């Protein structure tokens, strides 16, 4: 399955969940818990099976982080090799991706935009260009926008509008740089994610 690059609002409306984690997709008062389409309300009343709940949760988080199915599955496999709680480790790995930290630092208004900054070589890690969005950062890594992009209108606008206060990252807006201070704790991440359903989904596949 390819990476989703369509309307964020449509996906957020479908899942009743802010993929941007800001609620901006619903800022015009159009938030819906139903699925898109003329008969969304009728479909929403249908009881979702356990399988359906697991699939929906997987899709929701996959779209939120902007990963392809293969990337998502590989990240889960990597989390299984770590000590600790599998679901939490999985989310921590997703959060440790370079494109996600660029987003968390406020250098882009969306994860998709952050991914483009990385892909185009506009991001430095510890002073060196890294153009791989899936690059996993280590605690203490310094992330900054390269000099030629520090006055970019979109970057500055994103920084100005970023009101998030996350303790696992530290940002210097004046210098357009930041630090991955520590690994995030589960209570700092999206409470609307039920990672246990994703664990159950992949465990189901393994048993087949």
UniProtKB/Swiss-Prot annotation:
Database matches in PROSITE patterns: RIBOSOMAL_S4, S4
Top-level taxon in the UniProt lineage: Bacteria
Regions annotated as coiled coil: none
Keywords: Ribonucleoprotein, Ribosomal protein, RNA-binding, rRNA-binding
Entry keyword annotation includes Disulfide bond: no
GO molecular function annotations of the record: rRNA binding; structural constituent of ribosome
SUPFAM superfamilies: Alpha-L RNA-binding motif (SSF55174)
Cellular component GO terms, alphabetical: small ribosomal subunit
GO process annotations (BP): ribosomal small subunit biogenesis; translation
Gene3D superfamilies: Ribosomal Protein S4 Delta 41, Chain A, domain 1 (1.10.1050.10), RNA-binding S4 domain (3.10.290.10)
Domain S4 RNA-binding: 96-159
InterPro entries in UniProt: Ribosomal_uS4, Ribosomal_uS4_bac-type, Ribosomal_uS4_CS, Ribosomal_uS4_N, S4_RNA-bd, S4_RNA-bd_sf
PANTHER family: 30S 40S RIBOSOMAL PROTEIN, SMALL RIBOSOMAL SUBUNIT PROTEIN US4M
Role: One of the primary rRNA binding proteins, it binds directly to 16S rRNA where it nucleates assembly of the body of the 30S subunit. With S5 and S12 plays an important role in translational accuracy.
Family: Belongs to the universal ribosomal protein uS4 family.
Summary of subunit composition and partner proteins: Part of the 30S ribosomal subunit. Contacts protein S5. The interaction surface between S4 and S5 is involved in control of translational fidelity.
Name this protein carries in UniProt: Small ribosomal subunit protein uS4
Lineage, highest ranks first: Bacteria, Bacillati, Mycoplasmatota, Mollicutes, Mycoplasmataceae
């Amino acid at each position: 399955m390819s990476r989703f690059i369509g309307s964020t609002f449509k996906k957020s409306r479908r899942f009743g969940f802010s993929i941007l984690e800001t609620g901006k997709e619903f800022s015009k008062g159009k938030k819906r818990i139903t699925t898109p389409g003329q008969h969304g309300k009728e479909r929403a009343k249908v009881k979702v099976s356990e399988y359906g709940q697991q699939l929906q949760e997987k899709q929701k988080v996959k779209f939120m982080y902007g990963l392809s199915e293969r990337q998502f599955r590989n990240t889960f496999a990597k989390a299984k090799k770590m000590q600790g709680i599998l679901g939490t480790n999985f989310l921590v790995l997703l959060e440790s991706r370079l494109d996600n930290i660029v987003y968390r630092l406020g250098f882009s208004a969306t994860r998709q935009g952050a991914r483009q900054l990385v892909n185009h070589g506009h991001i430095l890690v510890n002073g060196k260009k890294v153009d791989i969005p899936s690059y996993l950062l280590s605690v203490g890594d310094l992330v900054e926008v390269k000099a030629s992009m520090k006055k970019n209108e979109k970057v500055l606008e994103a920084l100005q509008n970023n009101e998030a206060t996350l303790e696992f990252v530290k940002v210097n807006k004046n210098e357009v740089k930041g630090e991955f201070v520590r690994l995030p704790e589960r209570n700092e991440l999206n409470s609307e994610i039920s990672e246990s359903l994703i664990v159950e989904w992949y465990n189901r596949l393994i048993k087949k």
